[in-house]
C-alpha cells in the first residue's frame, strides 16, 4: 500500500512542477503578445509579428496550471477557522481534516467523470477551440487525468488522515 501512496504522491509532484512551468510559459506568452502588438503599433503596421490565439494559450495554460497543482496541494493547508475549532480535541481536528480532504477526492472524481464525458461528446461532435482550432477532446482528457489524480490523492490523504497515519504521507515530502 505504501508503494501506491508513494506513486500517487510522486506523480502529483511531477504535475505540480509542470504546473509551475506552465505559469512561466503563460507569462512568456503574454509578454510576447504584448511586445508584438506594441511593435506593430510603433511601426504603424509595417512589421506584423502578432499571432492569433495568445489569449487562448493563456486560458488553457491557466486551466492546466491550476488542475496540475491541485493534486499535490490538496493536503497542504486547509483553512480552519480557529473560532470554531480551538477547543476541539486533536483527534476531532484530525477527523475534520481527513473528512475534508476525502471530500476533495470525491469532488475530483466527479469532475474527472464529467470531463471524461465532455471529451467523448467533444470527440463525437468534432468541437474545436475558438482561435487555434485545436480539438477540445484531448484538452478535456488531460483535464480529466489531472482531476483523476486529485481524486486519488484526496482519497489517499483523506483516508490516511482519518486513520491517524498522516506521517506515511510526509516521509518523502518534497514541496517543489
PLM region spans:
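Alpha-helical transmembrane segments and membrane-interface helix-loop junctions
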Residues: 1-176
